[in-house]
């Protein structure tokens, strides 16, 4: 198996763990979304600053730098949508709804880069998209008829998936002009820019500061929304550079499987660490 395939599969595993910890921080610890998003952007901005101060890319067109920065901008809005839904819904429902991105990537990569997928690859893409549609279906609340109900709010995640797909295509377009480390670092600056503009308010900063001073809580967010995302993006950027972006995106469709499996395992082994409730219908979906 080629190394880029392993990297493409390792990425959703890393971010599945991140997702479950995010749910714990948001729902378990009750961290407000503005403070949470500030840390998400700020932590990546810190990593970016360290890398770029020590090794800034030279001889690169300004347009390429802007494109790398725009990757973070697009992904920032994707994350804002996802975190907002994650605070309200279970991870095993939110993450599949994000997996419409492979179909966008596959179609656009075919148009832009001339990439093509085999029938089996297209099957993998459609399974990912089908899972996202099922995740937007829920059972009527108590006192209702118990019918399956479509939740329009999940369309917000579909929009986020389109933005994520666009960012992956930009990554593919500039991979020959910048190193993997530089792309991920400049992406971090773009992420920080949006999060700071939208959420940098005195109350949010104070709440974040108080949270980071709590030794029992701070490590969760430092590792899960600091160290792990930076390394996760190194993995997927490397994979995009070495393999077809459409296939890399399709392999990222394994994330819902990892989230579901880790959630089920956590519910069994460490129920206090998992903030999700399984029902028979959701298990079937």
List each language-model region with its residue ranges:
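Juxtamembrane helix-loop boundary signature in multi-pass membrane transporters
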Residues: 1-10, 103-162, 166, 172, ...
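Helix-coil boundary and interhelical linker segments in multi-pass alpha-helical membrane proteins
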Residues: 1-5, 53-64, 108-121, 173-180, ...
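Glycine-/small-residue-enriched transmembrane alpha-helix faces in small-molecule transporters
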Residues: 1-32, 77, 146-182, 189, ...
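Loop-to-transmembrane-helix transition segments
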Residues: 3-10, 39, 49-52, 57-81, ...
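Transmembrane alpha-helices of multi-pass small-molecule transport proteins
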Residues: 10-21, 27-77, 127-130, 184-207, ...
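Hydrophobic/aromatic residues within transmembrane alpha-helices
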Residues: 25, 36, 85, 111-113, ...
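Alpha-helical transmembrane segments of compact multi-pass small-molecule transporters, enriched
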Residues: 43-47, 97-111, 123-126, 189-194, ...
């Amino acid at each position: 198996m080629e190394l880029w395939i392993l990297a493409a599969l390792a990425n959703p595993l890393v971010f599945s763990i991140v997702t479950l910890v995010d749910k714990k921080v948001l729902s378990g610890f009750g961290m407000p979304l503005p403070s949470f998003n500030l840390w998400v952007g700020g932590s990546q901005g810190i990593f970016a600053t360290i890398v770029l101060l020590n090794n800034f890319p030279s001889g690169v067109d300004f347009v390429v730098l802007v494109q790398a920065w725009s990757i973070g901008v697009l992904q920032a809005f994707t994350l804002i949508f996802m975190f907002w839904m994650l605070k309200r819904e279970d991870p095993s429902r939110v993450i599949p709804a994000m997996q419409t991105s492979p179909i966008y990537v596959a179609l656009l990569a075919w148009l832009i880069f001339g990439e093509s997928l085999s029938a089996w690859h297209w099957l993998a893409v459609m399974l990912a998209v089908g899972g996202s549609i099922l995740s937007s279906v829920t059972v009527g609340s108590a006192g209702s008829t118990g019918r399956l109900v479509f939740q329009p709010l999940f369309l917000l995640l579909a929009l986020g998936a389109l933005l994520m797909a666009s960012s992956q295509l930009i990554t593919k377009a500039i991979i020959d002009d910048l190193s993997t480390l530089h792309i991920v670092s400049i992406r971090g600056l773009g992420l920080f820019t949006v999060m700071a503009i939208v959420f940098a308010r005195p109350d949010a900063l104070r709440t974040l500061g108080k949270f980071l001073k709590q030794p029992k809580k701070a490590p969760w967010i430092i590792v899960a929304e600091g160290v792990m995302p930076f390394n996760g993006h190194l993995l997927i950027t490397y994979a995009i550079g070495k393999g077809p972006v459409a296939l890399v995106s399709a392999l990222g469709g394994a994330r819902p499987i990892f989230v579901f499996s880790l959630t089920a395992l956590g519910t069994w082994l460490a129920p206090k660490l998992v903030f999700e409730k399984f029902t028979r219908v959701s298990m079937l979906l």
